[in-house]
């Protein structure tokens, strides 16, 4: 089942189209990266899903049902602009926000304490939010997002303000939430997060969806039949009608690292067979474009051919 489906969603303002006929589907129990530069339309889509604003055209479905007010309790939303009440104590804050999502006070108390204990911060219960560091407040905001056990969790730059240790802690909790049945939507600029966590992605740029799909499928779409070869002996000599030497590095002890691009009709096993006859092969791998490569190139507006050339040159 699809956790979220947006169909032909458009949002216009007086002098600006924030979303232009965007359609995408987010599989249930996936970690979905919603990517794009600032002002692309990501936050507008998130606000529509959270019923903060309405679309001008199109429809949104949550687990097969048209978006309605009953979905408020199904969604957990961590906005980029954090919104805790600074004068409230941590415990009061968590209870208040959980009850807004439909939890009873007793259940909210139970869940709040469970998460504070999990993060080993139970002694923060009576601290005012204004007395917390940015990283500490981030933990409380994260807890408030997930403590009502939402089936759909939307995280807008969730690692902002965290040191590496706490970022890893939050990462582990996100994976655990996914494994326990939640669907996670990431809106992020951190491509390492996309590489490590996301199994599906969509890229929005200038209000339009540019690409979407399983991460591996997107990467495969932009492969350029380029291979990185480590070998000993001599510089590679390959038939120019079938291969292009993109880069060749010389290391100690006659060790070389050569990047080659093969014609599109040549398979990896054919390349290996040809190399074995010409050199002492020590390592062979296909060059897979990173999400950062794909993101930067598409946002720059390069066409497919220029993008493929760029990806073959970047090692």
Predicted regions and their residues:
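Structural motif
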Residues: 82, 243-244, 279
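Short alpha-helical
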Residues: 85, 192, 235, 266, ...
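ABC transporter nucleotide-binding domain
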Residues: 171-261
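C-terminal coupling/interaction segments
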Residues: 263-315
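ABC transporter nucleotide-binding domains
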Residues: 2-6, 11-205, 211
């Amino acid at each position: 089942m699809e956790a979220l489906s947006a169909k032909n969603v458009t949002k216009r303002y007086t002098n600006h189209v924030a979303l232009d006929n965007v359609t995408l589907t987010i599989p249930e129990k996936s970690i979905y990266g919603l990517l794009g530069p600032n002002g692309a339309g990501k936050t507008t889509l998130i606000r529509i899903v959270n019923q903060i604003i309405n679309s001008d055209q199109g429809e949104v479905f949550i687990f097969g049902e048209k978006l309605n007010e009953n979905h408020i309790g199904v969604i957990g939303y961590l906005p980029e602009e954090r919104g805790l009440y600074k004068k409230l104590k941590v415990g009061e804050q968590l209870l208040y926000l959980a009850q807004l999502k439909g939890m009873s006070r007793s259940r909210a108390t139970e869940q709040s304490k469970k998460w504070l204990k999990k993060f080993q911060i139970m002694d923060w219960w009576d601290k005012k939010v204004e007395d917390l560091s940015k990283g500490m407040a981030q933990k409380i905001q994260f807890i408030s997002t997930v403590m009502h056990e939402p089936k759909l969790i939307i995280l807008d730059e969730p690692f902002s303000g965290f040191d590496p240790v706490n970022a890893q802690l939050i990462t582990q909790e996100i994976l655990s939430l996914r494994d326990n049945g939640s669907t996670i939507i990431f809106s992020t600029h951190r491509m390492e997060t996309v590489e490590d966590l996301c199994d599906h992605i969509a890229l929005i740029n200038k209000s339009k969806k540019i690409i979407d799909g399983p991460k591996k499928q997107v990467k495969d779409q932009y492969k350029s039949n380029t291979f990185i070869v480590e070998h000993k002996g001599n510089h590679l000599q390959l038939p120019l009608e079938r291969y292009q030497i993109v880069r060749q590095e010389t290391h100690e002890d006659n060790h070389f690292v050569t990047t080659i691009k093969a014609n599109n009709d040549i398979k990896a096993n054919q390349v290996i067979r040809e190399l074995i006859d010409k050199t002492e092969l020590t390592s062979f791998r296909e060059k897979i474009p990173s999400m950062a490569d794909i993101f930067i190139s598409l946002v720059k507006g390069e066409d497919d051919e220029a993008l493929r050339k760029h990806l073959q040159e970047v090692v």
